[in-house]
Each structure stands twice: as C-alpha cells, then as structure tokens.
Amino acid sequence: MEIIPAIDLLDSACVRLHQGDYAKVTRFSEDPVAQALSWQKQGATRLHLVDLDGAKSGEPVNDSCVRAITSALNIPVQLGGGVRTLERAEELLAYGLEQVILGTVAIEQPQLVKQLAQRNPGRIIVGIDAKNGKVATRGWISQSEVNATDLAADFNAAGIAAIISTDIATDGTLEGPNLESLRAMANASSVPLIASGGVGCMADLLSLLALEPYGVSGVIVGRALYDGKVDLKEAIRAIGDGRLQDPPSSKPLMA
C-alpha cells in the first residue's frame, strides 16, 4: 500500500482544513517547495497536491507554486482542485504533473473525464469527495444527491488510473478513516482506490491494510504527518510496498 503525503495549497502556503471548512485553516508552512522536498527525502514515492483556491473558485491561483514543486521533485506528483476543463487538465499535465485529479467535473461532465482518460492513459484520477455517502463538489461547498458508490461504479470501464475516496466528515480530524465507507467504495469499483481522510496514527494506517485485498492500493496522509502523529519513514516501512511482516515496535500502535 502506497503512503502518499499531501500538500494543500492556499494562497501559496501549505495548509490543512478541518472537514473541508475554509474558515478552519491551519497553516503549516510558507514554503511548499521545501515541504515537498522534505517528504521526498523521507522516502515518499508520490506527492498529492491540492489547489484549495482552485477547488473553491475554479481559477488557477497557485500555478507558479505547482510548477516549482513539480520541477524540484524526482517523484510523481498528482494534483487536484479546480480542474474542470480538458484544456486545463492537459495544461497541468504539460507542466510535468504525473496525474491530474478530477472531482466536480466527474459528476457534472462524466463524458469529459472519460475523454481525458482515453487521451491520457494512466494519467487521470477521479476524486470522489463524500459526506454521509453523498458526493460534494466545488471545493466541498455544494452537496449533491448522487451516491458516492454509484459514481464510482460509473467509471469502472472509463480507463481512469484510480479513484481517490475522501470522507469529508473525517478529513483533518485525526479520528480515523471511515472503513465502512471505503469498503463500500472498493466493492463498487474495479478501479484501484486511494483512501483519504481521517488518518491520525499508525494504527489507522494498519487498519487500512485489511482493505488492501478489496482494491485499496494507497492512502493519502496530511495532518497526521504535520502534527507528528505519524512518521513518514516509519509508515512506509510498516505499511508501504516491501513492508515488514511485523509492525515497528518503537511506538505503541494502539491507544
């Protein structure tokens, strides 16, 4: 299972939101490039970027920062947030991003996502952000009546690289991932699933291993890394590809 550190960009700073609330912002770093390099140095095999300004407004506010991060790293970078047109998606891919993540457009224009996946094999990810099982869009500001599992199933044959399943209710809370929701999403789709939201400790990461046989291939970790609740090197050693048979014993795994 791949451990993917996250950098959320707001006004070119590295931040985290609590349950997607733009009024509840914690700033962790004013230098996202340095932060990205730090995650790479600690063993990250991929970086997850979110343009929060773009997600909210649809405008490419943080492009210079995105380009700087992509240029500085040797590992693949994936980006989501405000990517709502074919031209915008392919512009970002031309920056050197490995993959782009489409959320709002996946529910509003699913055919566009499928077209992009055909034009850019292996480089399109669908982001499904849900609260109480219903898909949220436009930076989590708008709530739809579409079931997250139904949307996941719709993209089974679309040729996308993966689905990122974010549980809004747990995102940024450190209270643990929604395993029931993730299992339902994995069962609904044959596409590799990346879990996002709620990871607060190593035990949470270990709990996700039970879902690996169902198709959960990775997990995005944000606040737990910044708060020091999870050590990236240790997480990769215990959970990542080539992991040990036994979890590390340097810290207690259960509270």
UniProtKB/Swiss-Prot annotation:
It catalyses: 1-(5-phospho-beta-D-ribosyl)-5-[(5-phospho-beta-D-ribosylamino)methylideneamino]imidazole-4-carboxamide = 5-[(5-phospho-1-deoxy-D-ribulos-1-ylimino)methylamino]-1-(5-phospho-beta-D-ribosyl)imidazole-4-carboxamide. Signal peptide: none annotated. Keywords: Amino-acid biosynthesis, Cytoplasm, Histidine biosynthesis, Isomerase. Gene3D superfamilies: Aldolase class I. One of its GO terms (molecular function) is 1-(5-phosphoribosyl)-5-[(5-phosphoribosylamino)methylideneamino]imidazole-4-carboxamide isomerase activity. The active site is at 8 (proton acceptor), 129 (proton donor). This is 1-(5-phosphoribosyl)-5-[(5-phosphoribosylamino)methylideneamino] imidazole-4-carboxamide isomerase. InterPro entries: Aldolase_TIM (IPR013785), His_biosynth (IPR006062), HisA_bact_arch (IPR006063), Isoase_HisA-like (IPR044524), Isoase_HisA-like_bact (IPR023016), RibuloseP-bd_barrel (IPR011060). Its EC number is 5.3.1.16. Pathway: Amino-acid biosynthesis; L-histidine biosynthesis; L-histidine from 5-phospho-alpha-D-ribose 1-diphosphate: step 4/9. The keyword Membrane does not apply. It is an enzyme of class 5 (isomerase). It is found in: Cytoplasm. GO terms for biological process: L-histidine biosynthetic process; L-tryptophan biosynthetic process. SUPFAM superfamilies: Ribulose-phoshate binding barrel. It comes from the Bacteria. HAMAP family: HisA. One of its GO terms (cellular component) is cytoplasm. Belongs to the HisA/HisF family.
